[in-house]
Every structure is written in structure tokens, then in C-alpha cells.
A protein has these predicted regions:
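Conserved N-terminal phosphate-binding loop of PLP-dependent enzymes in the Aspartate aminotransferase
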Residues: 1-446
Length: 446
């Protein structure tokens, strides 16, 4: 693990001169469509700190978008991946297999919800996992329709763009998209017209009615939902919504898929967010936090469903790369040894407490319309004071002020008005509180 000191340090403006030089090179060489939240160039990272090429140390509240949950240089990940690199980097599992792939699939069978027989297939990215979950569901059901939800995000490939709700920046100008994708309402409690207390029952009834009347349940291969909606704004579907949708799927022979790409692997204080309401999905897609920063994803599910695709129908040249598999085994080892579920719950306790204080005590605290999320997947929704009108400008201004003071935060949400917090689960509590201090000071600049 990197021995980077776990303390914030600013020695230049953000970004510094060396980052500015690299940014000029980037503009000349990298496609303009590849964005960056903060143009500081990383030299090393670990724990809750990112150190840039100018020697600035930033507090990390982003984890590379929920990827480096165990830190960006966790000892077990580095040790296992380094050993694998020394042995071999690639054979292609479909040509000559290797134990690491099998062992990752065994760990996934142990960790994912349910005590039924399970199997997995490994890929490279979250979007690949979602695409393959659709392929598997279609092979199993012999149906074609796929149901997704308002505010959902599932990736940037053609099919997953079609499954994603938000247009800009993910979809604009990139169509037409794959057919047989249908979108229905989700129980967004903060914005549900009759109140959060009614959202679960009413939204599930409305979604089921739309599926039944507009698509036909007998035509649906899969229902796919994030148990905590990520890019859509860290929306927790109101209680009762997920169980109702899962039961409807079960009653109608539809494969229920939990997209846990952002919420999985201890991020919400449980191995998987769907466990909160006792959901046992037919298939579960994972990526991001699975491998400590290395590119790996998976589809895991009921053995009889996973086996529906014909031999050779699943896979890919790089899928389940041996170095990434070694990283995943190191990440899971770290999660278990350090009780990162427990650490995520403590992060929630600290963050929600501090955010509630800001909401109630700051002169402009009513700009925080909602505080939500679980574990180390927490967000605030920013609104025009006294209303629920989304305030994307405030979210952007807060993020910019935090960046200038050495705190990396990210925005999200269909309306662009959500500030999200995804600190590494190994972040120290002093560093966590210092980051929240910076956020509180940033509010004073609004």
C-alpha cells in the first residue's frame, strides 16, 4: 500500500502548474468527449487521499466513482495482483482457463444474496455486465422486452444508453438505440406528488400497471433496477417498492436483475444494497468496487438461469482478466478483514449527522432539500430555498469551492442538483470530518 500521509496539503492553487502542463497535453491528445471532473493529475493515491503531480494532497470523497472502496493501493490487492503479473497477464479464459476466475465466481456465490445454487460470468465493465444480464434473461425466458426505471443508469454502450434515463451527457446525439427497452416510474420519495410515505405503494402499482397494459408481462424478459439509483441522484426507492416489483417479476416469470454496480461490495453497509429489504434477485450485476481499482465485472445468479445461454454465447477476450481477478480476491480479503460493512455504517452515521446539522443551522441550510443514501453512498439534493426546484448551479458552485480547498466531490442526478459522497471505506474519521468541514465552509460561499 502507498505510504502516502493521510492528511490534506495544498502547496499550489488547484490545479497546480504541473497539472496545467499535463492538461495542455491532454487537450491535444485525448478526445474532447472524455471529460474530467477536476483536472488535477494523480501521482499516487491511497486511504482517503489523492496526491497530485504538484504535491497537493486532496481528500477523496469520490473513490473513482465508487471503485476504490478498499483504497487505491490496498495491500492485499497490490500483493495478489503483483504476484499474478509475475506469473502471466493473459491467456483468455475461453482458451485456457485459470483458477483465479473460478475462485472469484466461488466468492460471488458465497457473498450474493440467497442460498440457492449460483453461477457467474466475468466481464470488464459495468455496462458489459448489464448487457450480458439482458442476454442471459432473454435466453432463459425466450422473451425480448426489458423494463428499466426513471432516473436509472446502466452504462454507455448502445443497449445500456437506451436503458439509461438521463439524456445529457450520456445519450445526446448517439442514437438510435436498441429496441425493446421500456421505462416505468420509480418511487422517488422526495419528489413523489403525494409524499414519500405513499411513494412505495403508489409507484409500484403504477409501474406494474404500465408494464401490464403497455408491454404485457408475458413479453418481458427482465426487470432491471439499481437498489440505490446511482447517477440518477442516489435515490433510495421508497420502502415497499422493490419487494413489490420483485414479487411481480416472480409471479410472471420475469428475471429480476439487481444492478449493484455502484452500490455493491460494502458500499451501503451491506455486501449488497438489495439486502436492505430482503430482496434475493435472480441475477445481480457487479463491477466498480469488486476489484480494488482493476477492471472487472460480473453477472451472478441462479444456476438454471445463468446456464440458459449456449456454450460460447457469453465471454470476451479480456473478460475476467487474471490480474483483475487477483485484485478482486485481494479486495474481498480486505473487505472481510477490515469489516468494511461496519466502516460504511460508521461513515453514514458521521456524514448524515454533520449534514443534518448544516441543514438545520446554516443560514442557507434550506438549500439542502434532502439528505439520503446508505453507508458510504450519501447525497444531498440542492434546491432553491423554500421550494423543491432543483438548483444545479448551487451543486456546481459547491463542488467547485470544495475542489479549490482540496476536497474531491462529485455531482449527479437527473437534474444535476445532487452532491454525492463516495469516500473510500478505509478513510480515517479525522479526514472524513475535515472534508465535511470544507463542505460546511463552502456553503458559506453560496
Amino acid at each position: 500500500m502507498s505510504d502516502i500521509p493521510q492528511e490534506r496539503r495544498l502547496v499550489t492553487a488547484i490545479p497546480g502548474p504541473k497539472s496545467a502542463e499535463l492538461q495542455a497535453r491532454r487537450v491535444a491528445a485525448v478526445a474532447a468527449g472524455v471529460g474530467s471532473t477536476l483536472p488535477v493529475f494523480t501521482a499516487r493515491a491511497g486511504g482517503g487521499i489523492i496526491e497530485d503531480v504538484d504535491g497537493n494532497r486532496l481528500i477523496d470523497f469520490g473513490s473513482g466513482i465508487a471503485v476504490t472502496s478498499v483504497g487505491a493501493s490496498a495491500e492485499a490487492v497490490v500483493r495478489r495482483a503483483s504476484a499474478q503479473l509475475a506469473d502471466f497477464t493473459h491467456t483468455c479464459f475461453m482458451v485456457t482457463p485459470y483458477e483465479g476466475y473460478v475462485e472469484v465466481c466461488e466468492r460471488l456465490a458465497e457473498l450474493t444474496p440467497g442460498d440457492h445454487a449460483k453461477k457467474s460470468a466475468l466481464f470488464n465493465s459495468g455496462a458489459e455486465a448489464v448487457e450480458n444480464a439482458v442476454k442471459i434473461a432473454r435466453a432463459y425466458t425466450k422473451r425480448t422486452a426489458v423494463v428499466v426505471f426513471d432516473h436509472g443508469y446502466h452504462g454507455r454502450t448502445n443497449l445500456t444508453m437506451g436503458m439509461t434515463a438521463k439524456n445529457m451527457p450520456y445519450k445526446q446525439g448517439f442514437g438510435p438505440f436498441a429496441p425493446e427497452v421500456y421505462r416505468v416510474p420509480v418511487a422517488y420519495g422526495y419528489r413523489w406528488p403525494t409524499g414519500a410515505e405513499n411513494a412505495g405503494a403508489e409507484a409500484s402499482a403504477q409501474a406494474i400497471d404500465e408494464i401490464t397494459k403497455q408491454i404485457g408481462a408475458e413479453n418481458v424478459a427482465a426487470v432491471i433496477i439499481e437498489p440505490v439509483l446511482g447517477e440518477g441522484g442516489f435515490i433510495e426507492p421508497a420502502k415497499g417498492f422493490l419487494p413489490a416489483i420483485a414479487q411481480f417479476a416472480k409471479d410472471n416469470g420475469i428475471v429480476f436483475v439487481a444492478d449493484e454496480i455502484q452500490s455493491g461490495f460494502c458500499r451501503t453497509g451491506q455486501w449488497f444494497a438489495c439486502e436492505d429489504e430482503g430482496i434475493v434477485p435472480d441475477l445481480i450485476t457487479t463491477a466498480k468496487g469488486i476489484a480494488g481499482g482493476l477492471p472487472l465485472s460480473a453477472v451472478t445468479g441462479r444456476a438454471e438461469i445463468m446456464d440458459a445461454a449456449h456454450a460460447g454465447g457469453l465471454g470476451g477476450t479480456y473478460g475476467g482478466n487474471p490480474v483483475a481477478c487477483a485484485g478482486a480476491l485481494g479486495a474481498i480479503e480486505t473487505m472481510r478483514e477490515l469489516d468494511l460493512n461496519g466502516k460504511a455504517k460508521r461513515i453514514e452515521e458521521v456524514m448524515k449527522g454533520r449534514l443534518a446539522e448544516m441543514q438545520s443551522k446554516l443560514p442557507n441550510g434550506d438549500a439542502i432539500g434532502d439528505i439520503r443514501g446508505r453507508g458510504a453512498m450519501i447525497a444531498i439534493e440542492l434546491v432553491k430555498p423554500g421550494t423543491k426546484e432543483p438548483d444545479a448551479a448551487a451543486a456546481g458552485a459547491l463542488a467547485k469551492a470544495c475542489h479549490a480547498e482540496g476536497l474531491l466531490v462529485l455531482t449527479c442526478g437527473t437534474y444535476g442538483n445532487v452532491l454525492r459522497f463516495l469516500p473510500p471505506l478505509v478513510i480515517g474519521e479525522d479526514l472524513l470530518n475535515e472534508g465535511l468541514d470544507i463542505l460546511e465552509r463552502a456553503f458559506a460561499q453560496l
